[in-house]
């Protein structure tokens, strides 16, 4: 992420950023976490997954990648696990709002928050909070990578490559990590655990709600144990079954989808263009024109004059 690959916002000068905005004003913001993923995988696994994905798509499409959000939201059953760094709910949401606003004010009015962690139900709150505060035209999308290719997580019984369903630091997630950043993995240290639940199977879903069960994985407290007690290893499932080969088809499909998403947005709304402002906001026309001008040009108003971000 510190290498001058030509895709990361924080490695660019403002001159380079201005030139890039003329070609593509879409930025991908990887939203990850710092979380215990067992003895064999790095604590930044969720973050590395989405940064590697974003890098590949940016190299193909010309979009920009923000340095990732390293610390994320965590549900109750994650709390207390060493190696996991949870952020207070309100602080996480407000931090995302601030990041979205900062990039919008710079000229990136099209943003994809590419999520790699179990916080898919929180990120949309930040997107809508941004919209409510500022009420400016924008395309802000939350994409959870595992939702883009749900058919690629099938078990062998369903015609897929995996022995077990996707949970956490398990066969599936470890396979994807081996495919995307093998240099950080120590598969010789992998361990297995047995997933536990207090209700019969079929009610509560697992990671990403990929099984389409009635109750979302985050829609309960008490349906399963807390991780620090039940899974001190940091693994929920069979990490030893993982291999990069199992994830290969899914990785290719996901990158294809991400590339398509970026290209579809940019073809519909080329650099400098957005959906009709009058369809997205009831702010006065003159105000919207000033806010959406190229930053630092004549008549431009900075975004922070349009809403109170500071409470």
Swiss-Prot record:
Pfam families: Creatininase. It catalyses: 3-dehydro-scyllo-inosose + H2O = 5-dehydro-L-gluconate + H(+). This is 3-dehydro-scyllo-inosose hydrolase. Its EC number is 3.7.1.-. The keyword Magnesium does not apply. GO terms for molecular function: hydrolase activity, acting on carbon-nitrogen (but not peptide) bonds, in linear amides; metal ion binding. It comes from Thermotoga maritima (strain ATCC 43589 / DSM 3109 / JCM 10099 / NBRC 100826 / MSB8). Catalyzes the ring-opening hydrolysis of 3-dehydro-scyllo-inosose (diketo-inositol) to 5-dehydro-L-gluconate, and thus probably functions in a myo-inositol degradation pathway together with IolG, IolM and IolO. InterPro entries: Creatininase-like_sf (IPR024087), Creatininase/forma_Hydrolase (IPR003785), Diketo_inos_hlase_IolN (IPR049842). Zn(2+) 1 binds at residues 35, 46, 117. It is an enzyme of class 3 (hydrolase).
């Amino acid at each position: 992420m510190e290498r001058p690959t030509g895709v990361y916002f924080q490695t660019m000068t403002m001159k380079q950023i201005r030139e890039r905005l003329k070609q593509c004003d879409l930025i991908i913001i990887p939203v990850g976490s710092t979380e215990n993923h067992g003895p064999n995988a790095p604590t930044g696994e969720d973050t590395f997954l989405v940064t590697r994905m974003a890098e590949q798509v940016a190299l193909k499409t010309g979009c920009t990648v923000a340095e990732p959000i390293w610390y994320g939201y965590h549900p109750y059953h994650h709390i207390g696990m060493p190696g996991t760094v949870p952020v207070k709910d309100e602080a996480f949401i407000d931090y995302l709002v601030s990041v979205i606003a900062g990039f919008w004010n710079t000229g990136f009015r099209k943003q994809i928050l590419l999520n790699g962690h179990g916080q898919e139900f929180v990120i949309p709150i930040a997107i809508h909070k941004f919209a409510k505060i500022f009420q400016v035209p924008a395309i802000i999308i939350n994409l959870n990578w595992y939702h883009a290719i749900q058919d690629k997580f099938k078990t062998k019984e369903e015609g897929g490559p995996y022995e077990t369903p996707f949970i956490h630091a398990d066969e599936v997630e470890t396979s994807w990590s081996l495919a995307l950043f093998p240099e950080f993995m120590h598969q010789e240290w992998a361990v297995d655990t047995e997933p536990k639940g207090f209700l019969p199977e079929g009610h509560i879903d697992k990671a990403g709600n990929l099984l389409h069960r009635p109750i979302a994985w985050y829609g309960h407290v008490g349906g399963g144990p807390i991780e620090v007690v039940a899974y001190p290893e940091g693994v929920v499932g069979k990490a030893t079954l993982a291999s990069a080969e199992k994830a290969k088809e899914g990785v290719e499909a996901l990158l294809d989808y991400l590339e398509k998403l970026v290209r579809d947005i940019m073809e519909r709304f080329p650099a400098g263009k957005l959906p009709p402002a009058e369809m997205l906001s009831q702010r006065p026309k003159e105000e919207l024109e000033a806010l959406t001008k190229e930053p630092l040009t004549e008549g431009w108003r900075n975004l922070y004059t349009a809403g109170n971000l500071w409470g």
